[in-house]
Amino acid sequence: AKKQLEIFSDEIIEFITLNNYVLIKTSPGFAQSISYYIDQLQMKEILGIIGGNDTLMILTSSNEIAEFVCYQLFP
């Protein structure tokens, strides 16, 4: 799944952490595919993912964990 995320890296426009969330803005039509591959990583730090058309939100347990998840996904 990590390899598939690398393939989609050009479609990720920006990402930020906000409290215990990671918000990722993508090119239109790519958020659900990217959220699927992030989910396939089965990171225990991720409590859930919601993907729309061009935005996805990752729920974690704390701000620190959200920053850790960002670092793991986008080194």
PLM regions with names:
Residues 2-70:
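Non-DNA-binding regulatory cores of transcription-related proteins
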Residues 71-75:
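Compact structured core domains
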